Curated annotation (Swiss-Prot):
Belongs to the type-III AFP family. The lineage of its organism: Eukaryota, Metazoa, Chordata, Craniata, Vertebrata. SUPFAM superfamilies: AFP III-like domain. It comes from Lycodes polaris. This is Ice-structuring protein LP. Residues 4-63 form the AFP-like domain. Contributes to protect fish blood from freezing at subzero sea water temperatures. Lowers the blood freezing point. Binds to nascent ice crystals and prevents further growth.
Length: 66
């Protein structure tokens, strides 16, 4: 199973992501792949993301799966 990106803290709506906000974890259902963490830095979330929430592609403005 591949790791997905999970919120390490509460991320308020419209916040630009930084490395400390995210961690890699194997979760079900899978979200954004952990290897995309470098691409997520600087992108904004379009909703509040609670700690422990798996980041899904539709939660991050400008993110497109490769």
């Amino acid at each position: 199973n591949k790791a997905s990106v999970v919120a390490n803290q509460l991320i308020p709506i419209n916040t630009a992501l930084t490395l400390v906000m995210m961690r890699a974890e194997v979760v079900t259902p899978a979200g954004i792949p952990a290897e995309d963490i470098p691409r997520l830095v600087g992108l904004q979330v379009n909703r509040a993301v609670l700690i422990g929430t798996t980041l899904m592609p539709d939660m991050v403005k400008g993110y497109a799966p490769q």
